Amino acid sequence: MDKLFLTALLMGMSVSGIHAQKATIEPTFTEWHDLQVNAVNRFATHTDFFAFAPNENLRGIKYDMKKSANYLSLDGDWKFNWVENADQRPTDFFRTDFDDSQWKTFPVPGIWEVNGYGDPVYVNIGFAWRGNFKNNPPEVPIKENHVGSYRRTIRIPDNWDGKQVIAHFGSVTSCVYLWVNGKFVGYS
């Protein structure tokens, strides 16, 4: 199977699974401003599950999905671009011919603030961004609304051809748009 180029735009909800369908879906890029849109092309919220490969020796891998032939980790260094204001984000970075050679790398999983982006904030109660912008619901601010754009090339194993492949993002702070090979897959 050809290599898979994965790009994601993360803005500022824990995302369960975004899956590709044959129908073409185009983002409006207004989803994150619309209180009525929680997801586009995302599985319904559900408990965690994982399908081990047939005849996989579950005792040998101790039911650890990361050791399964059906698991591909997205952990590692990704190309990364961070901006302070949402209107500064690159709007065409999902194109397969986009030049990200000037972008830095970022460890995934990773936290922006711990890795030098944004302002480190610890809040055990309340709202982490309190006082940073005018509270004007349902309006979402453009200024001081940090956006991270991620790019990575991965190889899908040849024996996955014809299988349903699900992208699982265990912890996205706010919104995510996902493209694969330059094609929009979903938003959550």
Write out the residue ranges for each language-model feature.
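Bacterial Sec-dependent N-terminal signal peptides
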Residues: 1-24
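Generic cytosolic/nucleocytoplasmic N-terminal low-complexity/intrinsically disordered segments
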Residues: 2, 21, 123, 129-131, ...
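Accessory beta-strand-rich segments of carbohydrate-active enzymes
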Residues: 23-39, 43, 48, 60, ...
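Activation corresponds to long, low-complexity, non-globular regions
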Residues: 52-55
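Extracellular/periplasmic catalytic domains that process cell-envelope and extracellular macromolecules
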Residues: 71-73, 160
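Core domains of carbohydrate- and sulfate-ester-processing enzymes
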Residues: 75-147
